[in-house]
Amino acid sequence: MQHLPRDWTATTPKKDYGQDLNLEICEEGQYRGLDLIVQLKSSATGDILNNRERHPLKVSTYNYLWDNLRVVLIVKYIEDENEAYWTLLKDVEPPANPEQENFTIYFPRQNKLSEINWNDIINYVRQVTDKKLASTRAKNKQNHS
């Protein structure tokens, strides 16, 4: 939470279905309907392969998050480094076998949460939101024509 922009609102869902935090984005003191889901992971030590941190994820959690219409940020905190790494769900390689229970996801080691450019995240959330709204508005326009 210490790395979040000051004005953002973080809420914890009452039931954990794969959403650990919901973040509402504040820009220039205004909330404009932009939000994202955060899935939190952690470990005592790192698990590095090819300069990427890795962590198991349940396929059911991946599917739940993938079917969600909001942007998903996955964060892994490593206790002995006192550092967290992040990736967007869109950048996670889907499970090779959808029938398996777990699969491995990777976090680029350069994606340190302490160094994240939140403007890049805001811009991506805005792109996704604008596409969804444009699609909905186009469908509504067709239905009312």
Regions found by a protein language model. Give the residues of each.
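Mixed-charge (Asp/Glu-Lys/Arg
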Residues: 1-17, 23-145
